[in-house]
């Protein structure tokens, strides 16, 4: 069940991969690359423009303590636990 306070990113429903918790608050988690695909398909952006838009307008935005997380699997390259 989605908490009433959980913020969802409008227009990125196809990129929602789940929910997590930050300080006992439910946070929506989106796949960064799927968000880029949505912008390319839905808005007709080039991939470079979609990445720039994501980085500046979406990932770079703070909309309060329930701000969604955008998981970028590329940041995991070279990391091993």
Residue spans for each PLM region:
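C-terminal alpha-helical interaction appendages
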Residues: 1-81
């Amino acid at each position: 069940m989605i908490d009433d306070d959980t913020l969802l990113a409008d227009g990125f429903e196809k990129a929602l991969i789940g929910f997590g918790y930050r300080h006992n608050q439910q946070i929506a988690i989106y796949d960064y690359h799927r968000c880029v695909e949505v912008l390319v398909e839905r808005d007709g952006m080039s991939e470079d423009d979609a990445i720039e838009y994501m980085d500046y307008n979406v990932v770079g935005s703070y909309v309060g303590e329930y701000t969604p997380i955008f998981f970028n699997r590329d940041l995991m390259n070279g990391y091993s636990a």
